[in-house]
Amino acid sequence: VVQPNWEKTGLNIFKVYGMNSNYLSITTTTKIITENKRYDVIIVDESHKLSRRYGKQHPSFGQVYNIQGFEDCNSHLEILQKMGQQIILMYDVLQSIRPANITREMFQRLTDGYEKKFLHTQFRIQAPKGKNYTSDDYVNGIKYLLYKDTKLLSSELTNYNPNFNREVFNDKSPDAYFGYVTGKPMHQLIEWIEEDRNFNAEHINRVLSGMFCCATVDKWSIAHGKDSSITHFHEDELNRRWNSTQENWININDADAEEQIGSVFAVQGIDLNKVGVMIGPDIQVNTDGMLEAVPDSHINTNNKFSVEEMKDPDNQFEFTLYILNQYYVLLTRGIDGIRLGFWENEAFRKYMEDTLNIKK
């Protein structure tokens, strides 16, 4: 069971390895639940994105609770547990990105008694040869940067090593895995990935962005998807639009495919070679020196609680986690390297430099 944006890719991968038996299905949660068959084993990729009963989501996610036998279920995970004799779940608490996703508490309750194993290494991230730091140093550093004040790092839900090598964030050499730009973020990030593409034509490089809006970044609408004349990011004379689709985005045939700016929904579960990430004003440093999400600067309404729900401090905290998780996904897409840019958010740059002890 995979995310919709990865279904076709997953089918092709399994076919390449000859795993296209009638006894094997590559599908999505809503499809497998609607078919309502029974399976010996169900493996769920990105189970942190399994849906729960919640109003703000695509209607198809809620319609499955009308199927006979599933009326009393409160999440897709509960339904899948009824359908499979054995359930294997790939879960990352740091990648739940909207209120309709299964909550941490629901997941813990439903998997009580399950055997739990941690993934200790991010194989998608490759530190350059000859460096003293590793991919784990980078991932643990990003976790510390985003979540140090959330108490998640000390929980049993995530794997975190506080003794990461900060050299990964202080490597100033041209082949450094990590780096960041100052000044005009979109210009510089595009220039960086295009320079790499000149030397490595086979590389799949993209600029990605948090889902923010401000005076120079327009709000996105689903109606904009196929109209290449509508752009959203404006930096001097340079204009770019959001990804035109979420499904199989990196393989689309649009004339401006490589120029589109990718959102978290287009790249979750996707590996890229080199990645530029723009961090915007939807995440700010508050008066207590902690990261806090700003609802008015975030464009996707399905990522937000209602106005009434946001009066609850617990939901305010959860919303901040959703935005932090979105940036965590973006910051862990690059195999060969990443550069950060800050769109109207120099406060975050300074916060990052101080938190990770980056020497200027």
Q: Which functions belong to the PLM regions below?
A:
Residues 1-12:
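Conserved Walker A/P-loop ATP-binding site and its immediately adjacent core
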Residues 58-75, 249-259, 298-321:
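Conserved RecA-like P-loop NTPase helicase motor core
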Residues 83-88, 260-360:
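C-terminal accessory regions
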Residues 100-103, 115-291:
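Conserved helicase/translocase motor-coupling segment
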